[in-house]
């Protein structure tokens, strides 16, 4: 009886609360408009592409800022999907070589870090980004690759990883022969496994390579790897597939994420970056029939779930690029990756190289997209508004300041009225300590004092009046490790 009375009491209290709840007339918000207050710096990007026929035109997809385009070689960028599509996270970009006005983009993130954004399928433009049409595949949620036939822009392959947090059927390799009006699923492994990488042999577009990745994400951890992680090949445009990952020379045991590339100079030469106990860079010189391991350095395969991307040079069969925290180049067939290409930001995720000029390239990293026209010796700046903030709050300043923690970067506080144009742009915003995924709060009585968190339970206190910052976390040691020189 007591339990029944308690239940009735709770329900009655809930009904009273609902009855007293205020209803807000949404017309009061109709005149409110969004405005950009900054910062003018880039955030994470997973996909990019350029056009062989238009040497100054490039695209990159932001994980939270849509698709961006430049027509002057990366000096100025502009968003081309804002207000035109219903997806803000663009993970795959492909430009048709025969008509650069045709661009396909895929939504969602497939580098499955702890905080990711899902997409809603594939979009297409036929006028260089002025207008867009949704082509379906909405339930894929995370698309890793889009590949356009080199001579027929209506033939397109999509590699879909699928739902990051659960099983679903709309994953695998999809193909269209009518520009995206209809799709056919040509490779499906299981509801638990999607596609991590996909590439077309430029010398014979009927030959396609794909890698399947068995992965499952939770907010607190990720399971990756299993018996369905494999390397696949089709010789008939996706009609049938054969497995290459059990061929002689490939690692035995459980595999994880695999990246794949084929040399445009020699179609028999393949490279794969394989996550496994005996993983590393593997090369085949007979189109996948046999393999040899050429390199197993940790710098190329650390945090495989976040990287595992490899790219063949379009002119030199001995040159291959591997992306990880840093950007590496090999000129001896993948044996040594001793040339590090310096880019404006770390954590590299995608690379497009002009098939007609290997000095022209664009890369995507955790700072956005950047362009090089000299083979990576120099790059354009990443000064566009694609900053990815994990958390935001406001202060009691007048006018109030907006404070946020940026992915793979510092925290930042910006006056809500934006840049006053009365001081240098560099003084527009200020760091308040902490970083990346941490929460921030300012003191209610003194808004110039900030408490900010970061990865690994780090906590700092920052006093803006004297620029003093100090660590105040409960445990004083950085749990991820310290150099031996700093130990007592």
Give the ranges of each region predicted by the language model.
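Beta-propeller blade termini and top-face loops
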Residues: 22-488
